[in-house]
From Swiss-Prot:
Protein name from the UniProt record: Putative RNA (cytidine(34)-2'-O)-methyltransferase
Principal subcellular localization: cytoplasm
Protein family (similarity comment): Belongs to the class IV-like SAM-binding methyltransferase superfamily. RNA methyltransferase TrmH family. TrmL subfamily.
Alphabetic keyword roster: Cytoplasm, Methyltransferase, S-adenosyl-L-methionine, Transferase, tRNA processing
MF (Gene Ontology): RNA binding; tRNA (5-carboxymethylaminomethyluridine(34)-2'-O)-methyltransferase activity; tRNA (cytidine(34)-2'-O)-methyltransferase activity
EC annotation from Swiss-Prot or TrEMBL: 2.1.1.207
A GO biological process held by the record: wobble position ribose methylation
Lineage: Bacteria, Bacillati, Bacillota, Bacilli, Lactobacillales
Amino acid sequence: MTNHVVLYEPLMPANTGNIARTCAGTNTILDLIEPLGFQIDNKKMKRAGLDYWDKVDIRMHDDLDAFLKTLGPNDEMYLISKFSSKNYAQVDYTDPNKDYYFVFGKETTGLPETFMREYYDRNLRIPMSDNIRCYNLSNSVAMVLLEALRQQGFPNMETSHHYENDKLKDNYNRPERYERNLGEN
């Protein structure tokens, strides 16, 4: 069982970089469907992904049709859209014989309407109030992906953290780091 986050023609490099970091932290494959709204080596995207780029399995697809041709018979594809009435948390993502693909549309216009109609039974919604048009793409990815991983028992992920084994602890255990930020009140 493998999870995939699929971004259809993403426009904002910082969102894509943040999503790549989430994919690195969850052992999730990131599929990018072109055209992208930025260059893959964009500085903002690189910064948002920090130094985790070597930990991300990124797969590029020329267009939506090219991506669809990569799906196998046991793959489950879900389209995340505000136009669905089915809640993403009401789906079972635990079949070990399936790979799960979570497809997210571009930040401004979402997924193509014809694509959503063709796969209408695969559309899922993240609940939200009518106070906003939509959630941030990166936040939406994290919500859906972590629900799938929760159901799957967080495979190959730390579910607790022990500070004494933290490879970064020396960088965060320096009092001067905090004193510098406190200032005088």
